[in-house]
């Protein structure tokens, strides 16, 4: 989700659509042990954190973009997608938003995964 968002937002001449499932939208919201290993401390590399954040590039969205997240995600917290939703609304961008209640990062259980795959497959088939 992180990479598909950044590709779509930063290279709209190349990418016409992307699906984002549980994206990291700001590395400040992610696991600091993992993030700081590669990016250093936010206090020391604030510009790097901002430059790598899809939130900093929403103005570039010109394609189709469904944003999907499980509200019980304990890996990439749903806060990431909530901030993305707000940034896209404030940038007056069209997008689709879908939340899976109480589902974790893997988005599974019952018919959940099949629903997700069917939704993504239909979106891709309609927009390629």
Model-flagged regions — what are they?
Residues 1-128:
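Active-site-proximal cap/loop segments of hydrolase catalytic domains
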């Amino acid at each position: 989700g992180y990479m598909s968002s950044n590709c779509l937002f930063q290279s709209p001449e190349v990418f016409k659509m992307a699906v984002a499932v549980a994206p990291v939208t700001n590395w400040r919201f992610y696991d600091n042990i993992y993030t700081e290993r590669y990016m250093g401390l936010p206090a020391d590399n604030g510009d790097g954190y901002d430059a790598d954040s899809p939130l900093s590039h929403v103005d570039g969205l010109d394609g189709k973009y469904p944003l999907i997240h499980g509200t019980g995600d304990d890996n990439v917290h749903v806060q990431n997608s909530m901030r993305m939703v707000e940034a896209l609304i404030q940038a007056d961008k069209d997008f689709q938003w879908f939340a899976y209640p109480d589902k974790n990062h893997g988005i599974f259980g019952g018919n959940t995964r099949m629903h997700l795959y069917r939704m993504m497959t239909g979106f891709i088939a309609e927009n390629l």
